């Protein structure tokens, strides 16, 4: 059996929801307190045992490459000033086996994954979406990517991460139609549906940003016609794969943070900061103070 060694991180999106901040800065470099969102993804991959990572980038994404490259001037400065803890943090982002390829035109997630065909070769691999951060406030939790890799060790089949979402929200996701009940959190899947209307959704089990796929997906993606949004949809290709190979779905029971929109990004930042040793106490005190002020502002005033 071939070991899962490689991961793909699609990072070619334009980040329009975060304009003007993302006009010249990659969305994936926006920080949660003091760490870019893409670094959380890379750390999850490494904790799971992934050995090689390919980041699929686009225009205005050079900052991602710079972040994971050596900065000799900064490292020398930190070393000279004896700032060893900061130097360690900088070193952690450079000692990684990272590769980069550019998606010339954003044609959807399926097309972004297709750019990795030569990198992956004939091996199973993981796709990790940067908008979904998993259990970042729980250091002891088993990484979701690791869970998928363990499933593959048992099934030798593609496995997609899913999570129950409110029924009214299913139109924002790919959704699975499961075959029966889950066995130890693992579903067999009948079909995959991309962004169904709530009345048409086969379940509330939405696909979230972790996929473990067999290399046969690439032949399907090369023939895949554009789907929703006139883009090459990875969900559609997985549904086609499911017709010739079994595809499973792993239900995630941990905490998922969606940093793909402003409010989700803000919630993630607050939750992570409340666990951050350098700021958590000050933030807790501020939130308590702010809560009291907001409650006071709700108290109706009575004029005489």
UniProtKB/Swiss-Prot annotation:
Pfam families: NTP_transferase. One of its GO terms (molecular function) is UTP:glucose-1-phosphate uridylyltransferase activity. Pathway: Carbohydrate metabolism; nucleotide-sugar metabolism. It catalyses: alpha-D-glucose 1-phosphate + UTP + H(+) = UDP-alpha-D-glucose + diphosphate. It is an enzyme of class 2 (transferase). Belongs to the UDPGP type 2 family. This is UTP--glucose-1-phosphate uridylyltransferase 1. The gene is hasC1.
């Amino acid at each position: 059996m071939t070991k899962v060694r490689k991961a793909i991180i699609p990072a070619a999106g334009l980040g329009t929801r975060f304009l003007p901040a993302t006009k010249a800065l990659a969305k994936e470099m926006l920080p949660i307190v003091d760490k870019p969102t893409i670094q959380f993804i890379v750390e999850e991959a490494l904790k799971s045992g992934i050995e090689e990572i390919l980041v699929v980038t686009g225009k205005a994404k050079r900052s991602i490459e710079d972040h994971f490259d050596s900065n000799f001037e900064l490292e020398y400065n930190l070393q000279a000033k004896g700032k060893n803890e900061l130097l360690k943090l900088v070193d952690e982002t450079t000692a990684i086996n990272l590769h980069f390829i550019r998606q010339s035109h954003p044609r959807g997630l399926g097309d972004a994954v297709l750019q990795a065909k030569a990198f992956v070769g004939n091996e199973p691999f993981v796709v990790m979406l940067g908008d979904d951060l998993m259990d970042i406030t729980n250091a002891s939790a088993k990484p979701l990517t690791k869970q998928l890799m363990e499933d593959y060790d048992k099934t030798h089949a593609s496995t997609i991460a899913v999570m129950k979402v409110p029924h009214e929200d299913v139109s924002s996701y790919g959704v699975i139609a499961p075959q029966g009940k889950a066995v130890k959190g693992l579903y067999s899947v009948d079909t995959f549906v991309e962004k169904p209307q709530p009345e048409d959704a086969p379940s509330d089990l939405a696909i979230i940003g972790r996929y473990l796929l067999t290399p046969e997906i690439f032949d399907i993606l090369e023939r895949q016609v554009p789907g929703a949004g006139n883009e090459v949809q990875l969900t559609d290709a997985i549904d086609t794969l499911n017709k010739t190979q079994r595809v499973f779905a792993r239900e995630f029971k941990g905490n998922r943070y969606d940093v793909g929109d402003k409010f989700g990004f803000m919630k993630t930042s607050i939750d992570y900061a409340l666990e951050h040793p350098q700021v958590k106490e000050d933030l807790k005190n501020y939130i308590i103070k702010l809560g009291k002020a907001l409650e006071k502002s709700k108290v109706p005033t009575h004029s005489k």
